[in-house]
Amino acid sequence: MSARPLCADLSRTGEEPLAATASRVDTWLLVEYRGLWGHEAAATSTLSPEVKAHLRALGAAPPRSRVLFVRRTERRSSPTIAVFLARSTEGATSVRRLELDGYDDLLAVDLETVGEPVGHPVLLVCTHGKHDRCCAKFGRPLYEALRNVVDEEWVWQSTHVGGDRFAGNVVSLPHGLYYGRVDPAAALTLVESVLESRVLLENYRGRSCYSMPVQAAERAVREATGALGIEGVRLISTRGDSARWLVVFAAAGVAWEVEVRCGEGELTHLTCDANELRRPRCYVAGTPRERAV
């Protein structure tokens, strides 16, 4: 019996849209962990029960938070553990870094007040192969390609960021920009867009500070106006229910209203290990309309 195709290959050949697929995250806690990453990386790690419970609590804390393990090849023998705290809220982005002597130190430090500001972007490449085969197959070559075109301090392997079938996946912090289906050959193009503080629409999944319906509207406004600067599009308002939304963005000195509706994609395997075919939820944006502010 032939092996099932990879979920990322199915998504790509089926031309599943990338737009409006970014996870909703405002606060990121990145913890360097050089041990094996199991399917549930933190749960299967060698961290103490107290540290595991602490990380679970941090991941559940408001605002919308996510805890990821990260690593870099050249830091395998480092005597300290790198920890990052990033904020991705619109208009208030930041990244801070601190070095700890051990994981138990996480229990004692106030992550809200410690750490040094990071003056460069942090690129997370999902290489979490135990979570999904596609993350390793497409993520690891992409990680190596990015390390070859930018300071290696900028690029980290990470555990699951969401959307395995869109691998290779990159999250650009502090802005929380999700990119998918990034090939190694496009590494330099992606880095150039990051350095120029603009969105690379070809691979853009969305911005983590927005819900998925708002992500769909943001992309529609960027496509209609050509406004690619990260801060060149600003959310004004959103209202709606579980099936229809009206979202207003400001861009190019104009307010734009976008109607977004919820739909379903084609039947597919959402992950490599999924046994059942499912229809992914999708968000379809109408044509942006100018409106009075």
Task: Enumerate the predicted regions with their spans.
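Histidine/cysteine-enriched polar flanking segments
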Residues: 1-293
